[in-house]
């Protein structure tokens, strides 16, 4: 592409961080395209670099800074004219970024979409708020049902970054979902910082189940629920999963820990007893459900005995999917006032122990699937190998089903029946049977 001053600028958009950020970038892209702007995947063909940053933990912040410095380098080389930075990192460090990187042409927070668009030569149109240009594969998308968070978890800076919890009205979400369906989306993944309290601010009660039922009626192949908080979780949605074939038997519910002292320090609002009862209730209501969770190892003051309690809990509960992260001492989180007593080396050691335990659990659970025929969604095809997921696996984080397709007529976005022949802790291997 030859750059000229007569045409509108071409944008290179780099979207970092979580799926919530992805949705923000998709909304921005749709608005910009409606104003006649074009986007390119080749930075050397761009006039403008726009980076949607993450500021959640140290590693994510560093990635955002590194990418911004690289973009500034492209500007200094004359490859691009302008560099704009938006998103979570700006919410936390706007002043510092402006002082340390004056080469940035504009800084925008998480709630400044009209301003970002104006800077790159586009116009914000309220009537296009529901429209998105997908950055995911076309067969699945994320539906952000709320913005912000009212929880005050001590390790988390999201409320400071994203502001208070604001639910999107059901009718608006249904319009957005209909547009996604028209684009060919088959799997809809419901996301927020906390889906459990969706609707309280609008309707005075949880509306998560109502929304799920309405979306189910629209005929999506799969509807998946991600990022549930254990406190105030609406159990009726678990029954809906059992009753509605297109609502996946899957819930992602980060628990973070199980020791009562640590949960209290984390300001989670729920203790061990209530957590265990909730898990029992979920599994009794829907025995086919798969439960994903996330844990933190090395929280300030975590003793070896408290960590062993967490290991025992995981051993007993046998989560279907589990991730673990070392505690990061983040200056904008309230736990920053605590002494970071566990060394980085010990944190990594504990993460390794926990994930080794989970690897054994996952391998055992996957072995039970050998010989079964499962419905899968084909995510991508590389040469003669297809990578797929079952309803029990969310995009990007869970098991892959790996299929040697040979001469089979298979396309990305297809649903197929697969006979599982072999497995590892995080992979299933099978052949197409229908």
Swiss-Prot record:
Keyword set includes Metal-binding: yes
EC category name: transferase
Domain of life where this protein originates: Bacteria
Protein name, entry field: Ribosomal protein uS12 methylthiotransferase RimO
Domain MTTase N-terminal: 9-125
Gene3D superfamilies the UniProt entry points to: Methylthiotransferase, N-terminal domain (3.40.50.12160), Nucleic acid-binding proteins (2.40.50.140), tm_1862 like domain (3.80.30.20)
Cofactor mode of binding and number, as noted: Binds 2 [4Fe-4S] clusters. One cluster is coordinated with 3 cysteines and an exchangeable S-adenosyl-L-methionine.
Binding-site positions, [4Fe-4S] cluster 1: 18, 54, 88
């Amino acid at each position: 592409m030859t750059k000229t001053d007569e045409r509108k600028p071409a944008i290179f958009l780099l979207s970092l961080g979580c799926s919530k950020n992805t949705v923000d970038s998709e909304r921005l892209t749709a608005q910009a395209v409606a104003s006649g702007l074009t986007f390119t995947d080749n930075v050397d063909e761009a006039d403008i670099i726009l980076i949607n940053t993450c500021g959640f933990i140290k590693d994510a912040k560093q990635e955002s800074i590194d990418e911004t410095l690289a973009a500034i380098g492209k500007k200094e080389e004359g490859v691009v004219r302008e560099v704009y930075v938006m998103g979570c990192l700006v919410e936390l460090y706007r002043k510092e970024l402006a002082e340390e990187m004056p080469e940035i042409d504009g800084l925008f927070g998480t709630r400044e979409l009209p301003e970002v668009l104006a800077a790159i030569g586009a116009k914000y149109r309220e009537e296009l708020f529901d429209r998105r240009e997908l950055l995911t594969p076309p067969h699945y998308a994320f539906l952000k049902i709320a913005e912000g968070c009212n929880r005050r978890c001590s390790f988390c800076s999201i409320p400071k970054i994203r502001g208070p919890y604001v639910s999107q009205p059901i009718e608006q979400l249904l319009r957005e979902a209909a547009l996604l369906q028209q684009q060919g989306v088959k799997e809809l993944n419901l996301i927020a910082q906390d889906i459990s309290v969706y609707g309280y601010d609008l309707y005075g009660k949880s509306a998560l189940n109502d929304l799920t039922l309405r979306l189910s009626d629209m005929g999506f192949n799969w509807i998946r629920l991600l990022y549930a908080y254990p406190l105030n979780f609406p159990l009726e949605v678990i029954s809906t999963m059992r009753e509605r074939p297109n609502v996946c038997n899957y819930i992602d519910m980060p628990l973070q820990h199980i020791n009562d002292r640590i949960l209290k320090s984390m300001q989670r609002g729920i203790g061990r007893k209530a957590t265990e009862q909730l898990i029992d209730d979920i599994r009794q209501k829907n025995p086919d459900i798969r439960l994903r969770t996330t844990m933190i190892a090395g929280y300030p003051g975590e003793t070896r005995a408290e960590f062993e309690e967490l290991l025992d809990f995981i051993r007993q509960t046998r989560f279907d999917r589990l991730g673990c992260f070392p505690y990061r001492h983040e200056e904008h989180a309230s736990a920053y006032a605590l002494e970071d007593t566990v060394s980085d080396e010990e944190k990594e050691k504990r993460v390794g122990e926990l994930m080794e335990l989970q690897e054994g659990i996952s391998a055992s659970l996957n072995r039970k699937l050998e010989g079964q025929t499962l419905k899968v969604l084909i995510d991508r095809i590389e040469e003669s190998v297809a990578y797929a997921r079952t309803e029990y696996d969310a995009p990007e984080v869970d098991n892959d089903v790996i299929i040697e397709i040979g001469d089979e007529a298979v396309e990305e976005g297809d649903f197929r029946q697969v006979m599982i022949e072999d497995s590892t802790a995080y992979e299933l291997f099978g052949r197409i049977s229908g």
